[in-house]
UniProtKB/Swiss-Prot annotation:
GO BP term, example: phosphate-containing compound metabolic process
UniProt binding sites for substrate: K16, R30, Y42, Y126
Gene: ppa
Keywords annotated in UniProt: Cytoplasm, Hydrolase, Magnesium, Metal-binding
Binding annotation for Mg(2+) 1: D52, D57, D89
Binding site for Mg(2+) 3: D84, D89
EC number of this enzyme: 3.6.1.1
InterPro entries: Pyrophosphatase, Pyrophosphatase_sf
Enzyme class: hydrolase
Pfam family, one: Pyrophosphatase
Stated family: Belongs to the PPase family.
Protein name per its UniProtKB record: Inorganic pyrophosphatase
Length: 163
């Protein structure tokens, strides 16, 4: 399964950018309150709706960071199940579908334990100093469950009147 991911935040950034879905422009939401930086490029899957009412979040493993607004054709290799103050907030873990350097990454167990722990740690602490915000990490699931969530998110989007 391949899909498009729109990047909002490049790897290494402490700025949290979001696409304004009404104007199509990129807005600086905030600088992270903690001293952590995004461990991968971060964005969303086009034409989806996650459990939190926003497009489904996606992390993209790349050697070099891209830029806000960059569109990348991806495939999922797993998903980090988590919740925040608004409810379910799952994060897909993806790789560019045309990059031969990541061809060996086909499922979550192909990602090193340390890399998974680094991503998990980021999401467990990145909101720590923000008033009224909270995060609860859960666990990693594999490609099959990630792809099932993508399908559910496409359906939620369509059921809400998306095209």
């Amino acid at each position: 399964m391949e899909f498009d991911v729109t990047i909002e935040i490049p790897k290494g950034s402490r700025n949290k950018y979001e696409v304004d879905h009404e104007t199509g422009r990129i807005r600086l939401d905030r600088r992270l309150f903690t001293s952590t930086a995004y461990p991968t490029d971060y964005g969303f899957v086009e034409n989806t709706l996650g459990e939190d009412g926003d497009p489904l979040d996606a992390l993209v493993i790349l050697d070099e960071p891209t830029f806000p607004g960059c569109l990348i054709r991806c495939r999922a290799i797993g998903m980090f199940r988590m919740t925040d103050e608004a409810g379910g907030d799952d994060k897909l873990l993806c790789v560019p579908s045309t990059d031969p350097r990541v061809e060996h990454l086909r499922d979550i167990h192909h990602v090193s334990e340390f890399d998974r722990l680094e991503i998990q740690h980021f999401f467990e602490v990145y909101k720590d100093l923000e008033p009224g915000k909270s995060v609860e990490g859960a666990d990693w699931v594999g490609r099959t469950e990630a792809e099932a969530e993508i399908e559910r998110s496409y359906k939620r989007f369509k059921d809400q009147g998306g095209h």
